[in-house]
Amino acid sequence: MFLPRPDFRIALFICFMAVSFVISRFGSEVRPTLLLALPLVLGHVSTGLIGFVLNVIAGHHSTVTLAASTIGTALLWLPMLVPMGTLISLTVLVSQLHGAERERDIGPLFRQALWLAMLLGLVMFTFLSVVPALLPLFGIVPDIVPGAAKFLHVVRWGSLAFPLYFCMRYFCEGMHCTFPTMLLGFGGLLVLVPLSYALTYGRFGFSEYGVEGLGIATVMVMWLQAVVFALYLWRSRRFAHLQLFAHLELPCWARIRDLLNIGLPIGISILMEGGLFIVTTLLIGRFGTDEIAAHQIALSVAQLCFMIPMGVAEATTVRIGHAVGRCDLLVMRRVAWAGYAIVIGTQTLSASVLLLGYDVIVAAYTDDLVVASLASKLLLFAAIFQFPDGLQMLSSGVLRGMKDTRVPMLLAMISYWGLGMPLGLGLGFALEWNSRGMWIGLIIGLTAAAVLLGWRFRVVSERMFAGIP
């Protein structure tokens, strides 16, 4: 049973007026941010579409396959979030060096970031090797455990490729070069779709691997993207003067420490947020196969929408880092407000799509009526948290560009684990609202993060203008 579509014209009008006001004051910075963000957004959307396609393929194979891939993917993302976040420090430092015209320091920094990426890849491989044996301890429905374990055993072989790819990607973004992210994202999608379909269902001469096929295809695409990115940087004339691969350097712990001082709090912050969703997924696994399948449908759609503000936030990080490197605080503030205007606009669009088209979206995933009904309700919650999710992401990006990472880490911890998770547990388990209660906890945690990180941006920017370190 699908829900009636609410009338949200007043909310849309308010958002439109807010965006119009900010653009009227800071419009000159909107266009450069959009030009830098567009390839990043498209690259992230391609990543989101990969998750969407994998879920559609798994969902039409069987509900158990979808549930197993959901648990497996959640546990895959848990160690992936740390290198994703930690290596963002490379974008921050490269953009500031580029803005300060100290490009001779970029090549050595990049080579040390590669060492850090390999170290993080080793940690990721170890985690994915150990965690399948622990699956029964999570209280997940027994039917799901074998498939999730098989998926994790396969995808661990992409542990090194993943952080190396992000290291190269973050370097390019710091240099205002965002098209490789877009091209490799869609290239990976074009390879993954037929490959995962063939391996999951046993088409085009391949054996039927089920959920393992999704893992095999994912690993192959991870390595393909990493190798192609490395070849691009090696052959690119644009970066030839930086001598990225001129020679092999031993690890320099002083430079790696600089990367970790900025990046590790970012990695922990992202782990706090991503971990909230991952643990929520594992807990919803206790409610049964239908609940976890419906949750995954709603979550994958919400994650696809999230790719847009993520790209805008990354572009804002680069532009703010560049402005800070030039000591241009006025431009820094204008870029930040332009980013907020863009995100409010994109999130209004995302929420509108979810509110208007949730039944069509659910039908693309599954023909199971019970799962479809549950997923339709959860998509309405996903529409609500588009705004706090986008705003907290943008605030995080702004603060990263200003090299403020430690206090935001603590604010994220308070918001997600001090507020969002306890409320979700209370509503989901104590009041027996099941997945709906857990999603309300997500909304509250994201809203708290949006408010606190926005406040932090105001405090830090006022200190910078006052000349206070």
Curated annotation (Swiss-Prot):
Transmembrane segments: 10-30, 34-54, 74-94, 121-141, 179-199, 214-234, 264-284, 292-312, 335-355, 369-389, 409-429, 437-457
InterPro entries, A to Z: MATE_fam (IPR002528), MATE_MdtK (IPR050222)
Cellular-component GO terms for this entry: plasma membrane
One Gene Ontology biological process: monoatomic ion transport
Topology within the bilayer: Multi-pass membrane protein
Key words, A-Z: Antiport, Cell inner membrane, Cell membrane, Ion transport, Membrane, Transmembrane, Transmembrane helix, Transport
Primary localisation category: membrane
Listed Pfam families: MatE
GO molecular function: antiporter activity; xenobiotic transmembrane transporter activity
Family statement: Belongs to the multi antimicrobial extrusion (MATE) (TC 2.A.66.1) family.
Role description: Multidrug efflux pump.
NCBIfam families in the record: matE (TIGR00797)
Protein name: Probable multidrug resistance protein NorM
